[in-house]
Amino acid sequence: MAAVMAAPEPAEAPSSLLLLVVGGECGCPGLLAYVLEELERGVRSWEDVDPDVCSLDEQLKAFVSRHSATFSSIVKGQRSLHHRGETLETLVLLNPSDKSLCDELRNLLMDPAPHKLLVLAGPCLEETGELLLQTGGFSAHHFLQVLGDKEVQDALASAPAAPALTVSCPTFGDWALLGPAPGLRLRLNPPARLPSSEGLRAFLEYVAESLEPPSPFELLEPPATGGFLRLARPCCYVFPGGLGDAAFFAVNGFTVLVNGGSNPKSSFWKLVRHLDRVDAVLVTHAGADSLPGLNSLLRRKLAEREAAAGPQGQHEERLRRLLSPALGVVFLNAREAGSRLRGGEDEAVCARSLLRSLGIVPLPLQRGPQPSCPTVLFEKLGVGRLELFVLHPPPGDPAAPACALLVWQPAAPGDKVVRVLFPGRTPPARLLDGLQRLQHLPCLRRPVVTTQDLEVPSRANSQDSLASRDSTRKEPVRGTVGATSRSAVRREPALATRDQKKDTKPGPTRSTVRDVRRSGPGVVTTKPRVSQNGPRAPVPAAPPAAPAPEFPGEAENIVESERPPAPSPTLSPAQSPPPTAPGNSPERLSLSPLRPEPAPDASPSATTPTLTTPSLPAELGSPHSTEVDESLSVSFEQVLPAGDAGLSLPLRLARRSTSPHDVDLCLVSPCEFSHRKPPPPASPGSSDSSARSQERPPETPPTSVSESLPTLSDSDPVPVADSDDDAGSESAARDPLPTPRVPPPLPDAPGICMVDPEALPPRARQPLSTANSSRGRKAPARPSSASAAPRAATVAAKTKGPVGDRSRPLSARSEPADKPGRVPLTRKPSVPKTVPKMASATRNSSGPSSRPAPLAAGSPVYLDLAYLPGGGAGHLDQNFFLRVRALCYVISGQGQRQEEGLRGVLDALLAGKRQWDLDLQVTLIPTFDSAVMHRWYEETHEQHQALGIRVLGSGSLVSMQDEAFPACKVEF
C-alpha cells in the first residue's frame, strides 16, 4: 500500500485528498454522542493519508477556522461546510436530504482525486442500518444505485488509475452488501489506526455544535402571520413522511392527524399551526418512522406550557410562539417502538411520557367483536357523521399495527360519502380479512356513494315522526346511532332554526337556503339564478361549537375555538360525542369556503373539471390572506386570460368572518411525474357560459390536478331533473316507496371519467329548461347508482407538468363557450348499454321482493383514497388491487424495504387494474422520489393511458400565505 501511495507523490496536485462527512440532526443527547463517536472512528480510519504529503491535523484546524457555510434555500435546515486546502478538500453535510446526499456522493465518485474518504454518521435504524435523513433515508441500496449510474461508471473507467475510496458507515445492517466495484478500490469500515489529534478534537467540537438539536420553538417555527385555517370541504393532505407516512384528514368540523413521519421537523407543522385544534391523532404503528414528527409537536406543546408559566415577555411575541393547536383524543397502541434508532430513545416510550405530561391518556385501537360497529368520532345534525372502523388488530393483540378506515357521511343527500384507508404496517392478508368483514356495508360496494343512497333503507324503516317531514330528504337519520346520541344531537338549537326556515318558507326559498352554504354570497357570474341568490343572507353549513373544552392538563387556547369539541377519551363504538352549544351570531356561522363552486353545466352529459387555481378566489376574499406569491399571481392571470365583456369568472369570494385572522388555503401545486410526454390535444369537452369555458393557450400547462385528472369535483354534479328542492309534482317521482330496500352489488357502469348521455335515466335526459324552469338555481344532483360514478374525488392541487394523457376521456382544457352542443369524449365501447338501465330500474324498483344480492367471497371494496401498507408489511399482489379499489393510492415510506419491493407493487397495480370491471380513473401519489418508479413509469407509460392511471410527481407543494410546504391536497 505504501508503494501505491508513493506513486502520485511527485505530481501531487492541490486537493488530492477528498473528505466528505455526512451528519444527521440529533434529537437527544445519547444520539449526539453516538454520532460523534462514528465521526471520530471514520476520520481515524483513513489510512491513505501520507503524513509527508498531507498533515490531517493541520488541515482540520484550517477547516474549523476558514471554512465557508452555505444554507440551502430549498431544503430548510440543511447546511454545507466547505474548505479547500492545499492537499485536502473537505465537505461536511449537516442534516441533508436524500437527494442532496446522492448528488454529493455522485460528485465524490466522479472527482479525479486518487484518495477519498466518505464518513456516514447520523441517526440510523437498528434493523437495517439505514441513515435517517431530513427527507427519506440512505442505505447501501442507495449507494449502489449511485455507483451504478452510467455517468459515474464512465468517469471511473476514464481515470488513469482506480481511485481508492474508504467508506465509514454503520457496521450492522445491510452495509455488508458493499463489495468490490469495477474501477474503484473500495474499503469498508477499516479499523481506526490514526491517533487522535488537536485538529480532530476541534473539528468534532465544531460539528457537535451544529448537530445539537434546536429548541422546540426553533424546530417548529411560528408563522410570519397569524390566523386560523378553516377546512370546510372533506380533504386529505398527503405529506412526505420520510421513512414513514404522515397525513391530515379534515371534514367540516373535525380534523384527524395520522402519524407524524420520521423527520423531527414535522412535515405537517406548517399546516396545523394555523389550526386551533386537532380533534384526533391516529398512530397506526409506533416506531422511528412514524413518531418523531408527532413527538416534536408534543415537545413544543410542553415547552409552550412552561413558557406560559415563566416570566412574562412581550405580549405579541408570546402569542406568536404559543400557537400550537389543542389536541383531542390520541389513539396509540404499542408501548414500545417497533423500530428504533441506534443510540436513540424509544419513540413510543417518549410519546407516552410526553402525553402523560400534557394530561392526555392515549386510547388503544382494537377490532371489536362486531367489526361493522364503528366508533363515532364526530356527529352533528346538518353537518355529517365521521365513523372510525378498526380493521386490525383483533382483540388480544394490542401491540400489533393498527389499520383504520374513516368514513364520512355528510348530511346533504347529494354529497358524496368519503372513505379513506390508513393501513399503517398491517400485513396485506390481515387487511383484506378486515375489509371482508365490512364488504357488506353499502358505502363500500360502489365506486361513488352519496348520502341519499344510504338513507333510503333507514327512511323506509324509521318509525320516527321525522320520516313524514320534508326535512328528512335533507337530514338523513342513521339507524346505527343510539337513542342517546340522536336525542343529544336533536337538542341543538340549530336544528330548530333550520326547521323553522324550512317549514315557513316556500320550496324555492328552501332550495336557496340549503344551497347557499355551498355557493356562498358574492358569486361573480352572469347567470340569473346565481344573481338571484346573491342578495340573500348566507346560511352556514353548520352551526359552530362553543370554545372546545380542553383535555386535563392541556395548554389553554389563545383564541376561541369554533370547532366542536373532540370526543371524550372514553369513546365507545356507536357513541357520539357530547353536544355543543351553538353560537348565536349568524356571522360566526360562516365557515369561509375555501374553493370556488364551479357553475353547473348546461347539458346533463357535459362535465368540466375544476379550473386552474381552485382556492385562489378564497384567498383573494380573505381579509388577511393577501400575501400571495407574485409568480403565482402571474400564473393565474396567464392561465385565465381576459374573456369577453359578458363573461366573468365564477369565482366565489370567501365570506368574511368575525375573526380577524382567518387564513384560507390558497394555492396547491402537486407536480405531475416529470417525463417527456406528447402534447395532449385540446379536449372537446363542453362547458357552460361562465369563464370556465374560456379557451386557454395550448402551451400553458394545467396547474391543478383537478384539471389533469379526468374526475369531477363535488361541486360539479351531473345535472339531473329530479331534485330534493322541488315541492311540486316531482316529489312523488323523487321519493321511493317506503319499503325496505338494499342496493344490489354494483354492475358494470360508466366509468368515473365520463357520463354517457344514453346511459342516464330518462329523467336525467330531460332538457334542463324543462326540469329547472321553475327554479332560480339548479340544485345539486342526486345521482343514481349509474350516474353517481362521475362524482369522484378531486385532487385539488396544481401540477407543473403537461397533462400528457391522450386516452383520457376528459381533459383539463375546455372549449370556448360558443360550442354548447359538444360533449366530453367517453369510452362508450367499454360500457354495456344495458348496465345503466338495470341500475336505474333497481333504484326505481320497490317492494318486499327487493333484496341485496349475495356477496361473493373476495368481493371488491371501493374507497376514495387508500394508503398502501408500508415498511415491508408484506407483498402486495394483483389480488390486493383487485379487491381494494381506490380512486387514489398513496405510496409512502422511503425505506430500503419499501424500495426493494416497489417494482412488484407497481406492476401488481397494473395487473389488478386491468381486471377491474369498471372503467375508473386512478391516481397514484408517491410521497418520495425513486429511480425504480422512474424506470417503471417510462417502461409502462402507454399502459397507464389505456388503463386510466395517472402518476403524480413527488414534488407537490401547498402554498399558504407567504410560504410553501411539500404536500399534496386531495379534495373529495
UniProtKB/Swiss-Prot annotation:
GO terms for cellular component: cell projection; centrosome; cytosol; dendrite; microtubule; microtubule associated complex; microtubule cytoskeleton; microtubule organizing center. Residues 880-904 are annotated as: Necessary for the mitochondrial aggregation and genome destruction. One of its GO terms (biological process) is brain development. Residues 644-879 are annotated as: Necessary for association with microtubules. Residues 537-550, 564-581, 737-748 have a biased composition (Pro residues). Coiled coil: none annotated. Residues 489-505 have a biased composition (Basic and acidic residues). Residues 1-715 are annotated as: Necessary for the microtubule-organizing center localization. SUPFAM superfamilies: Metallo-hydrolase/oxidoreductase. InterPro entries: MAP1, MAP1B/S_N, RibonucZ/Hydroxyglut_hydro. It holds the Pfam family MAPB1_N. The modification Phosphoserine is found at residues 462, 585, 590, 592, 659, 683, 723. Residues 454-469 have a biased composition (Polar residues). It comes from the Eukaryota. GO terms for molecular function: actin binding; actin filament binding; beta-tubulin binding; DNA binding; identical protein binding; microtubule binding; tubulin binding. It is found in: Nucleus; Cytoplasm, Cytosol; Cytoplasm, Cytoskeleton; Cytoplasm, Cytoskeleton, Spindle. Residues 602-620, 702-721, 781-800 have a biased composition (Low complexity). Residues 600-972 are annotated as: Necessary for interaction with RASSF1. Heterodimer of a heavy and a light chain. Interacts with microtubules and actin. Both MAP1S heavy and light chains interact with microtubules. MAP1S light chain interacts with actin. Interacts with LRPPRC, RASSF1, microtubules and VCY2. Interacts (via C-terminus) with GAN (via Kelch domains). Interacts with WDR47 (via N-terminus of light chain). Interacts with ESR1. Belongs to the MAP1A/MAP1B/MAP1S family. Microtubule-associated protein that mediates aggregation of mitochondria resulting in cell death and genomic destruction (MAGD). Plays a role in anchoring the microtubule organizing center to the centrosomes. Binds to DNA. Plays a role in apoptosis. Involved in the formation of microtubule bundles. This is Microtubule-associated protein 1S. It comes from Rattus norvegicus. The lineage of its organism: Eukaryota, Metazoa, Chordata, Craniata, Vertebrata.
